[in-house]
Amino acid sequence: MVSWGRFICLVVVTMATLSLARPSFSLVEDTTLEPEEPPTKYQISQPEVYVAAPGESLEVRCLLKDAAVISWTKDGVHLGPNNRTVLIGEYLQIKGATPRDSGLYACTASRTVDSETWYFMVNVTDAISSGDDEDDTDGAEDFVSENSNNKRAPYWTNTEKMEKRLHAVPAANTVKFRCPAGGNPMPTMRWLKNGKEFKQEHRIGGYKVRNQHWSLIMESVVPSDKGNYTCVVENEYGSINHTYHLDVVERSPHRPILQAGLPANASTVVGGDVEFVCKVYSDAQPHIQWIKHVEKNGSKYGPDGLPYLKVLKAAGVNTTDKEIEVLYIRNVTFEDAGEYTCLAGNSIGISFHSAWLTVLPAPGREKEITASPDYLEIAIYCIGVFLIACMVVTVILCRMKNTTKKPDFSSQPAVHKLTKRIPLRRQVTVSAESSSSMNSNTPLVRITTRLSSTADTPMLAGVSEYELPEDPKWEFPRDKLTLGKPLGEGCFGQVVMAEAVGIDKDKPKEAVTVAVKMLKDDATEKDLSDLVSEMEMMKMIGKHKNIINLLGACTQDGPLYVIVEYASKGNLREYLRARRPPGMEYSYDINRVPEEQMTFKDLVSCTYQLARGMEYLASQKCIHRDLAARNVLVTENNVMKIADFGLARDINNIDYYKKTTNGRLPVKWMAPEALFDRVYTHQSDVWSFGVLMWEIFTLGGSPYPGIPVEELFKLLKEGHRMDKPANCTNELYMMMRDCWHAVPSQRPTFKQLVEDLDRILTLTTNEEYLDLSQPLEQYSPSYPDTRSSCSSGDDSVFSPDPMPYEPCLPQYPHINGSVKT
């Protein structure tokens, strides 16, 4: 007998009603059995296929003629009647079909002379495919076939997939809405956003509509994708609709979180194997390193007080997170004993956990040591007695010293003062030929700590106890400063709006709106040092029209207030986005009409002002290191002012830079030499200025849209650059390209940029309004930097010599020119 399990090819068409596929051919085979039994005639043909949905009734008819007795089998097992199976003549009925009823059925007709068998294939399956768009390759479809004579209005075929109406997803995720439906004739589907027709040009990157799956797919969602999405399914007999609500949540910036208790302490014998496991949870892509604490010249710490470290394992281009989270140590020796640290960092900060490895002697060596237990016990007792004696002597000496030098608190004032020097970092120029920024830990300010002698408070109870030296040139009376509403939180504390009476010396009785930086309630000594350092930096830099200027400070008789200029129109990125025309990509509200109409000259003027501000900072030997539209503020008179240039950043420990408050990764604004070599110069600021120009002429667009960070490193190394914005002239775009030259020395200076922009601004008239209704061009890495010879994988810009290792902080690995952040 032929084995049907090997030669039956089934084509199953999903249907709502029972359908029958007729055989296309038949083959008759006579088989001679034992002489005493009548010959059996098998009707071996392609089985008839019956398809039914779960719960439906199934009826199969045996088409054999002249059948005296008909018997039924399923998968070779005799089939008898029961509460769901009914056998009536040549008919087999199955009530309430289930997937278990699927299989190969056969009916055999027994006659006096011979017998004949007929086969059927039954398939009980859902009419609706369960495949998502991720499984499109399986060919499953959500279409439902209808009897051509049964006309029907649209209806939902799988409401379970539509129950979740509210979708809240993090930014950059993919969102899919589904509306599985049926009807006759087959209905059509269209999508609305906020009640209006949803078109491809309404979002950057467009969207996908999978009609065979009744789905809408949006990749890399952004906050502007928030809203109500309605699917409308209709044919000539009716229309139905269903609405989803999408909420895009900005990612919460947080340094990596390490699972408690991991890595765990471990012990093994010499020659054994051991592994440490470190579980890292991070929203932003983390960079993970395994570090071992080592000794040099018998010491675990260097002259600077930092421990000696050795990097054992770091993430590379082809390393997965699961691989880097496990550290294997094979064939352990005594030298492997010690402290091991799992260090993880992202753009927000770093976290680390440590564990100890104890190495025990091998069983053979242990016997040698235990051969003379008397000597070992004697040594232990001697050491113990010696330590106890030392402790007793130390306690006696301390008590004698305290007794002879105990101060008389009753004769002293209630408050004492202790002068504490806090080292403040500032930028200096190494030489006339180099504009790289270095560190100087020279104490700039002496800060006096107030100590209470009548309470058992710790010596440094809080930064609110500190007294700063008064600077008459900048000191401003507290009683003339009225604090207002909060404006936000910065690197060192919070910023509030305030009214300062008489801060403008030309108008001593007039109140001026200012911004005040202050520490938070839980601020640390380092936060105070950072804020004082920023204030001192702003004092040294001086004033300019296109930077945020220091107006004064309140340092006496209260918390530290740093008073700076107030910019009423917020940061430049949001300022530009708010002035986009309706319908433009990234537009948060397509129905909103912008308050002001931007002209081409406005954008050139904005760029020119920022170039002047950076030219001034460069002349003052100040390197910004985070130049971007988010760090530019706009005043009421549309004057551009560069902010955050006075932050005291430690450039030697810049591996993990703080993420900005709006969640953007600074690496997209960083020059290659800053990204890979940690070299920050005025030329690296010029690179960032080119990205800032791109932001301006795209009215607040996000650089390298849709490009992952790892892919960005590769593209920059190969010489790719962003395309020209749709509303930017070739001359301005070539200026951007010059700023993005791979060789820092080939980039223009800020002085040259000011001269070029001044010329362009002079030739530009106010009548040159921008046609911003056209969509912005998509970024495509198809424009390599053909003018630069520094795009090869072996170029020194992207494959630098390793820099001296710095303890406690992860290093960027130069593996194939890629860095994991």
UniProtKB/Swiss-Prot annotation:
EC number: 2.7.10.1
Annotated effect of mutating A628T: In LADD1; strongly reduced kinase activity
Residue numbers on the Cytoplasmic membrane side: 399-821
Glycosylated residues (UniProt): N83, N123, N228, N241, N265, N297, N318, N331
Effect of C342S: In CS, JWS, PS and ABS2
Region entry Heparin-binding, spans: 161-178
Listed GO biological process terms: angiogenesis; animal organ morphogenesis; apoptotic process; axonogenesis; bone development; bone mineralization; bone morphogenesis; branch elongation involved in salivary gland morphogenesis
Effect annotated for changing R203C: In breast cancer samples; infiltrating ductal carcinoma; somatic mutation
Domain Protein kinase intervals: 481-770
UniProt note on regulation of activity: Present in an inactive conformation in the absence of bound ligand. Ligand binding leads to dimerization and activation by autophosphorylation on tyrosine residues. Inhibited by ARQ 523 and ARQ 069; these compounds maintain the kinase in an inactive conformation and inhibit autophosphorylation.
Effect of M391R: In BBDS1; the mutation selectively reduces plasma-membrane levels of the protein and markedly diminishes the receptor's responsiveness to extracellular FGF
Primary location: membrane
Mutation effect (A314S): In craniosynostosis
Region of interest called Disordered, as start-end residue ranges on this chain: 131-151
Reactions catalysed, as given in the entry: L-tyrosyl-[protein] + ATP = O-phospho-L-tyrosyl-[protein] + ADP + H(+)
Limits of the Ig-like C2-type domain: 25-125, 154-247, 256-358
Impact noted for substituting Y769F: Increases fibroblast proliferation. Decreases phosphorylation of PLCG1 and FRS2. Decreases activation of MAP kinases
Result of changing A344G: In CS and JWS
Effect in UniProt of substituting S351C: In CS, PS and ABS2
Effect of S252W: In APRS and PS; common mutation
Consequence of substituting Y375C: In PS and BSTVS
Similarity annotation: Belongs to the protein kinase superfamily. Tyr protein kinase family. Fibroblast growth factor receptor subfamily.
Listed name of the protein: Fibroblast growth factor receptor 2
